[in-house]
From Swiss-Prot:
The gene is SPINK1. It comes from Homo sapiens. This is Serine protease inhibitor Kazal-type 1. It is found in: Secreted. SMART domains: KAZAL (SM00280). It holds the Pfam family Kazal_1.
């Protein structure tokens, strides 16, 4: 009984530690496609890691290329 309790506590501790590695808090890269004619006007806002809201991922990619930066998407939706 004591061994089972220790095993369950150990398994629970391992599961809680493996749940969040902190990588998600950094953000994710925008899906950049080679848009020769520019970006669509579809409003699907994303929040950049620079604290600015971009109308969509394409606009964020365009700004990254223009400014030679690598701003990530912190979350979907406005900041």
């Amino acid at each position: 009984m004591k061994v089972t309790g220790i095993f369950l506590l150990s398994a629970l501790a391992l599961l809680s530690l493996s749940g969040n590695t902190g990588a998600d808090s950094l953000g994710r890269e925008a899906k950049c496609y080679n848009e020769l004619n520019g970006c669509t006007k579809i409003y699907d806002p994303v929040c950049g890691t620079d604290g600015n809201t971009y109308p969509n991922e394409c606009v964020l990619c365009f700004e990254n290329r223009k400014r030679q930066t690598s701003i990530l998407i912190q979350k979907s939706g406005p900041c």
